[in-house]
Each structure stands twice: as C-alpha cells, then as structure tokens.
Amino acid sequence: PVQGSLLGVDLAGILTWGAFTYPAAFLVTDTTNRLFGMGPARRVVVVGFAFGVALTLIAALGIAAGVSRSGALSLWQALFHDPDAFAMLRTALASGSAFLAAQLLDIKVFDVLRRQVWWKAPAASSLVGSFIDTLIFFFLAFAGTGLPWASWAAGDFCAKLVMIGLLLYPFRLLVRLFSTPFRSPA
C-alpha cells in the first residue's frame, strides 16, 4: 500500500504502488504492438512476466531463508509456513498471473482496434487490460486474508484510469518518434 494521505484520505487503505507502475507496462506493450506488431509485443510481455515473477520469487525465498536460519524450518517449509514468505509467494503468483493474462488481452484488443483513431487502441486495450489485471491480482493475492483488498482494488483501478489518460500523449510521441522505418502495416 501507498503510505500517506491526500486531502485527508489515508492512501494506504485504497492504493498500491502497482497502480502507478503497471500502466507503464501497457505503454511499452502498446508502443511495441503499434510499431512492430503482435508477435514482438507478446515477446516483450513474456520477458516482463519472467523478470517480474523471478524478482518476487527471489524476495519470497529471501524471507524464507531468513526464517529457515533459525533451524526450526527448512527453506521450503518456511516458504509455505511463514506468513511473510507465503504472502510474498502468493503475491508473486498473483502478480504473474494477472500480468500475463492482462497483457496478452491488451495485445489482442489493441490489434482489433489498431486501424481506428490513434488513441482508441491504446486507451481501450489498456482499460480492459487494467480491469482484468486488477481483478485477477487482488483476488488471488488478498482474498481471504482479512486485508482491505476490495478497496485497494477499487483505488488501484481508479489510479490506473488516470495513468492511462496521462500516458496517451507519451504513447503518441513514441510512435511518432520511431514510426516510419520500423512500423508494421497499420
């Protein structure tokens, strides 16, 4: 959660950092899709997926290693029985699942709309992808934990909507900057 407050609202109850970083992944995917097509965009997603899951799993294993040093549990036992290590593992699986499903859906929606007005494909695909990402991630990571995951999901999605709007102009600039020699047809 984001620690702090804005206009008297406690942001920790409604917002996570992923709301700000995740839309940048859509910017990269949509720009790659526009310039090079669906195949290269899918490859970018797979690399991002592997990198993100690996980093989170390393963090989970790091927590488990600290717990297992006490001698009471093995590394694998600590990973599944220590609440902090298991939460990180659950977050890794939720994040990876949500990222992969949402980004691949984003690529397909973008491709269907690629011949429309320049902003429709990135706006619609990011909107649909962000919704799916938010739904999958927060449900898998936090459902049944007693944490305020529904309010985090709502705040996260609203922040993603703002970020989608803010990133449309950089999308247009990147596409114009790199367009002619690299661009795939339409």
At which residue positions do the language-model features occur?
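A structural feature that tracks compact, well-ordered secondary-structure segments
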Residues: V112, S125-S126, F137-A143
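Hydrophobic transmembrane alpha-helices
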Residues: P1-V46, V53
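Membrane-embedded alpha-helical bundles of multi-pass transporters/translocases
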Residues: D82-L100, V109-V112, Q116, G144-W152, ...
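Transmembrane helix-bundle signature of multi-pass membrane transporters/permeases
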Residues: F49, G96, A123-F131, A153-K160
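Transmembrane alpha-helical segments of multi-pass membrane transport proteins and ion-pumping complexes
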Residues: F26, D30, G52, T56, ...
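Alpha-helical transmembrane segments and their helix-entry boundary regions
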Residues: P40-V45, W118, P122, W149-A153
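Internal alpha-helical transmembrane segments of multi-pass membrane proteins
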Residues: R114-F131, F182
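Membrane-interface interhelical connector segments
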Residues: L61-M88
